[in-house]
Amino acid sequence: ETGIRQADFTPVFENQIKQAIDEFAGDDISYAVRSSATAEDLPDASFAGQQETFLNVKGHSNILIKIKEVFASLYNDRAIAYRVHKGFDHSKIALSACVQRMIRSDLGSSGVMFSIDTETGFEGVVLITSGYGLGETIVQGSINPDEFYVSKKLLKDNKPAIISRSLGSKKIKMQFTGSSSDHDQAVQVVEVEEGQQRKFSIDDRHLLELARQALIIEEHYGKPMDMEWAYDGLEKKIYIVQARPETVQARLSGQTMERYQINTHGKLLISGAAIGHRIGSGQCKVVTSAQDMHMINEGDVLVTVMTDPDWEPIMKKASAIVTDSGGRTCHAAIIARELGVPAIVGCEKATEVLTDNQLVTVSCAEGEQGNVYEGELDYKLLETDIGDLPELPVRIMMNVGNPARAMSFAGIPNDGVGLARLEFIINNKIGIHPKALLAFDLLDNELKEKVSALTYAYPSPTEFYRQKIIEGISTIASVFDPKPVIVRCSDFKSNEYANLLGGELYEPHEENPMIGLRGTSRYLAEQFQDCFAMECQALKYVRDEMGLTNVWIMAPFVRTLQE
């Protein structure tokens, strides 16, 4: 590494670089200098973040310096450790430096996208993450980004194709400074104003444009792809700045279903986004600096703010990883998937809640939400060879309440969904009584503020309600299409509705809610008809506009002929 840094380029090489820059756009604009190695992204290795990237580099001499730094990074500690772990021959690795014009995403947004679901390997969607400013914050895992799923089939059919939107906190962004000679001074991290945090960092039009590009790139390479993108805030254009093969789900056979099952539940300490589907337990080691990495022993649970490529040698020692920040496409998530280590990212306060030597169990086996429990809990691994399952003389449909589990369930032999309940969507994705959304202008200021915090990114409170139901139903329906998906309309009891935000204002106290105002009788009740109308509008949109006519509708708890 030092030898490369101290060596001189030949005058011929230097002149060729200068000439290329002048022909391209001149040296008065800024460039990104990035690595592209032959061993990067082999079928079972992502090499995520192993070599250097430099942003906002200006001038011939600075570009040449950074090219040399990229070459030298082939032999930094983390790259050597990664190759040793993967069994690659150091002499068989070749590397080039890629010089790209800098996209002004510091004035726009940027992110990562996969043409496959990173957690389940379901190939029918494009997963897109997005944040403000330069994409480094997402790749490094220093923000919790916005996250979207786009259905490939609906996109190809020219139907509304965005089936899921999750708002990330996006508290910071990276932008350029005036300096361009030193990488550390060429960019700076600033806070994102609160109003922007509460909005999505990319609009639907650009999301769909990105998803179309993902399909083109996937078709070109003939395999699932991992891509980085940037939206130029000056040009108002989207650029794809990197594409490489996805390295984890694409190599799984899909014939053996591995399922971890937690048998007991302890006290829930903290939650975040689950990476993978495994469970791990051990003693916490709270590490806030790379200097303290030596504290991690085999089998410890690594707890940190975020990881970067320097952490890779110790990540494989950990039984599990828990971070304060980051999304499903950050460095920690990619490496954890590759190593088969359960990880929970974006917990916000893990380094405050968890303490050194505290015994915990980290579970990624309960859906999209990963949970950290107190103590060492009992769990088991169940393995099923799907290829060996017998043909059955009956149709087997499954229950899917949580849309986030639909993609993993779709891999199990099935004949569709016999019951998709709206209660999970209303409880977990909405959390607000529908009447409070309809009567938003009449709410007191305190309740208004709480409702606004949840609905701010949507055109109106009622549109938030409709949209979340549309997203939940369309996720399940598009994943199982063309098999039937029977959606049961809401069947909360009055005491359950009262637990939603604002619910106590609208719900009666009933001695026996089990046979009270629920199901179809509630839909017909004058005080609830406008609430039920929003459900109907959502169902109609999914069937008529999105074309998901595999959705069947079930009316629950029908007690009379009139109902």
Report residues per predicted region.
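N-terminal beta-alpha lobe that positions the nucleotide/phosphoryl donor
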Residues: 1-98, 194-205, 210-212, 218-222, ...
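A structural-propensity feature for long, helix-poor, extended segments
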Residues: 1-9, 162-180, 347-377, 451-461
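Conserved alpha/beta-domain cores
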Residues: 21, 37-47, 92, 106, ...
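Conserved metal-phosphate-binding beta-hairpin within the catalytic cores
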Residues: 49, 222-247
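Conserved catalytic alpha/beta cores of large enzymes that bind or transform nucleotide phosphates
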Residues: 125-226, 231-232, 272-281, 304, ...
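Acidic, glycine-rich flexible loop/linker segments
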Residues: 234-235, 248-250, 269-273, 278-301, ...
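Non-catalytic terminal/interface segments that mediate subunit docking, oligomerization
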Residues: 256-306, 501-518, 522, 527-540
